[in-house]
Amino acid sequence: MTENKISSASDTITMYCTQPDLVWDIVDKDGVNYVKQAYITKKYQDTAWVFDTAYKFFRQEAVKIIPKPQEAESPIWMYRDKKWAVPNAGCRRMHLEIPKDELILFDRRTWNKILNMEYVGTDEEIAAFEQEYKRQGVRDPLDIMKSSFYPLLAQKIKKSWQHLFTDPLPEETYWQGAVWYLKKDWVVEEE
């Protein structure tokens, strides 16, 4: 597995993260915060299976890059470009300086494809996969992941998700990052 690392003189990378006020209050009070999987299931309800599937893949691969603390059940997402970290009501955006050895970087566009349960690859690979599933009578590719009728196709989709960790990093505006926890020491300022 190729790690998406960058080189620079600094030991940290500037990132932006939006979280509910409660999370930042915990970080401020306790110095650290970890995400619980139950929060994700509660937040997404009917579509939780999509997030469970994508997050499970991410966790399984991310621990190969940065070991996961026992307290962490899910990663925390952040962005290099603050325009992607838009706070909703009851949330705050923080400017963070994350140590490079704590941060996994990847292309946010690829991650969005994974969250949509899509096949990831070159245009040619995607076209070939589309032909394959259409030959098998699949009209909506989401059905591949929703049902248990297409295990080989689902396996191919999940295998294609490796691109998240093996493709070179794109231009910085598309960098997304993940950490296993948020630390008070990383907060530079509230935006």
Predicted segment positions?
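Short, well-structured hydrophobic secondary-structure segments
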Residues: V50-K83
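Conserved NAD+-utilizing ADP-ribose enzyme module
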Residues: K5-I13, Q19-W49, A72-S74, W84-R93, ...
